[in-house]
Amino acid sequence: SIQLFKDEMHGNRIDIDLENNMLETISIKGMGKSIYYIVDKTNLLMGYNKATGDTINLNYKGGNLNTLNIKGDARGIFYPEIGRTKIDSILNYKSSIINYEINEELTTLYENVEIEYHNTTLKSNNVTIDWNTNNLYAYADEKEESEIISQGQKPIAGRNLEFDLINKKGIIKLGKTAVGDGFYKSNIIYREEPNIYHMNKSIYTTCDHENPHYYFK
């Protein structure tokens, strides 16, 4: 059977630029909304993405969508086609800016990033999702660390974070978390399961200062 998909765009104003009778750019301003369908190289549906923001800019190359950029209260929801993609749950995300690189299958979120997947929430300054590998990379800034929160668990914060969306495992660099009345800090924290972590070069302390006065190593 043949599957037909129709991408949708809505907004208060839509500007379209053509070059040599080919679509070059589309700019959506004011309450921008877009729905686009994701297909593999055999044209099978892998899922669809809903996105909203103050402005949405779409850039085309050779008549095909190349990049999609959303600015201002950018939000998105990815709905996977169950059975055709390894992503097995809806993924919600929001940030100040979202940039989609269609051909490279990369999504990058900038500033005030929050992502919800299964029972896990990630907060960070910058996040890149590589859909080729289904890996997520979070990078903190100087003022605020990346933070991952699993349902029923204490938050874990760190400078950089790598997370596999398929097996739910991850690595947190320069991480820290609360356990009971104390705190663990570690150069690297490996997340094996939502409640199982392995730490490398770690310390334990009940002192809540950034540089604890005492600790066990």
Residue locations for each model-derived region?
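Structural signature for solvent-exposed beta-strand/loop edge elements and short helix-capping sites
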Residues: 1-217
